[in-house]
Amino acid sequence: MELLKERIRRDGKVKGTDVLKVDSFLNHQMDVELFAEIGKEFKRRFADREVNKILTIEASGIGIACVAAEYFHCPVIFAKKSQTKNIAGDVYTTKVESFTHGRVYDIIVAKEFLGPGDK
């Protein structure tokens, strides 16, 4: 997506040799108009697919996922990075390495929100 590439070139900041900071428009301060364009692009690319849920991980993915979900008219589920008291019972879990935090998380999603028929 050219709009996103241009925004990264203009406002992204390189830290060291392996980190691209996009916190001024993507994951700390969020440019909702940019997110809307990204959501439209997801809809265009997946227009021929049945999408009934969007799954992301907390925290940076939530904003874009919510805007994209408006174009697909579906709910968003986000994987949590830690167990909480209000998630009990059957859950999906896997390990995910966070490049920016330099650690591994055991992420979880309640099975009641993500089933075998979801796309």
Regions found by a protein language model. Give the residues of each.
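Active-site-facing substrate-recognition patch
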Residues: M1-V51
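Short, flexible loop segments at the rims of nucleotide/cofactor-binding pockets, characterized by
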Residues: M30-L34, L55, E97-G102
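A generic local structural motif
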Residues: K40-F42, G63-I64, D106-V109
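A glycine-rich, hydrophobic loop/mini-helix early in the fold
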Residues: F42, F72, F78
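Short glycine-rich phosphate-binding loop at a beta-alpha junction
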Residues: E50-E58
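Short Gly/Thr/Asp-enriched flexible loops that form oxyanion-binding sites at enzyme active sites
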Residues: G63-H73
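Short, glycine/charge-rich flexible loops or terminal/linker lids adjacent to PRPP-binding catalytic cores
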Residues: P75-K119
